């Protein structure tokens, strides 16, 4: 469940979600939250026994970052490690939309033993290169990929075929997390059609 504040975290805990992804500015696709919020989120999720994943994304827009932006992301990851965060989610691409392996290695090294989820930057990678990208990520310790199966402007109903193909092509050990447009009303249908047990969304459970 993706949230942007403490109220969202508590609501997710009360609803019994397995994992919480903390962001800032969900309306922009999620950006890095402030560290004070993260520290409080660590306390809440640790007490509840729920994994906390924190977004590492310095700005909205594309995922082709400058050297200065990468340095910011590196420092962010190190700070999150010091705060006791369980995992982080990020993604870096080249100007042509392929995986930026050099920068990814730097960020993965900074993450150390934290879980790393490759976020929806995956959907900007050309379809013909996504399979090799999954292989590379798994070889470098990334075991979860968040994907909508296409542009977020498309309904998830129109990207189901590609999601099925992505899941079928995923190497053993890689978990594909369908997201973007998944909510408590359609989650069961989507999970059944894709034969997955994990989904991602801001409204993945019905809040009371």
Q: At which residue positions do the language-model features occur?
A:
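Hydrophobic faces of well-ordered beta-strands that scaffold small-molecule active sites
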Residues: 1-3, 20-22, 50-56, 88-90, ...
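Catalytic cores of alpha/beta
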Residues: 4-15, 61-79, 116, 123-140, ...
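Active-site-adjacent beta->alpha loops and helix N-cap segments on the catalytic face
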Residues: 6-10, 26-51, 67-71, 93-112, ...
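Small-side-chain structural scaffolding
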Residues: 9-17, 41, 85-91, 110-111, ...
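Glycine-rich phosphate-binding active-site loops on the catalytic face of alpha/beta enzymes
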Residues: 17-31, 79-96, 140-155, 182, ...
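A short, flexible beta-alpha/helix-coil linker loop
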Residues: 26-27, 58-62
């Amino acid at each position: 469940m993706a949230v942007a504040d403490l109220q969202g975290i508590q609501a997710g805990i009360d609803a019994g979600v397995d994992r919480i992804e903390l962001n800032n500015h969900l309306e922009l696709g999620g950006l890095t939250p402030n560290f004070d919020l993260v520290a409080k989120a660590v306390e809440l999720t640790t007490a509840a026994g729920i994994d906390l994943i924190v977004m590492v994304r310095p700005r909205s827009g594309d995922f082709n970052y400058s050297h200065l932006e990468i340095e910011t992301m590196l420092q962010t990851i190190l700070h999150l490690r010091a705060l006791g965060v369980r995992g982080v989610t990020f993604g870096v691409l080249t100007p042509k939309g392929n995986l930026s392996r050099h920068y990814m290695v730097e960020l993965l090294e900074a993450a150390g033993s934290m879980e790393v989820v490759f976020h929806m930057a995956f959907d900007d990678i050309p379809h013909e290169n996504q399979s090799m990208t999954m292989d590379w990520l798994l070889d470098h310790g990334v075991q979860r990929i968040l994907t909508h199966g296409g542009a977020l402007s498309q309904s998830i109903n129109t990207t189901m075929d590609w999601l099925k193909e992505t899941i079928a092509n995923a190497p053993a050990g890689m978990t594909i997390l369908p997201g973007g447009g998944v909510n408590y009303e359609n989650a069961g249908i989507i999970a059944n059609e894709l034969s997955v047990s994990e989904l991602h969304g801001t409204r993945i459970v019905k809040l009371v």
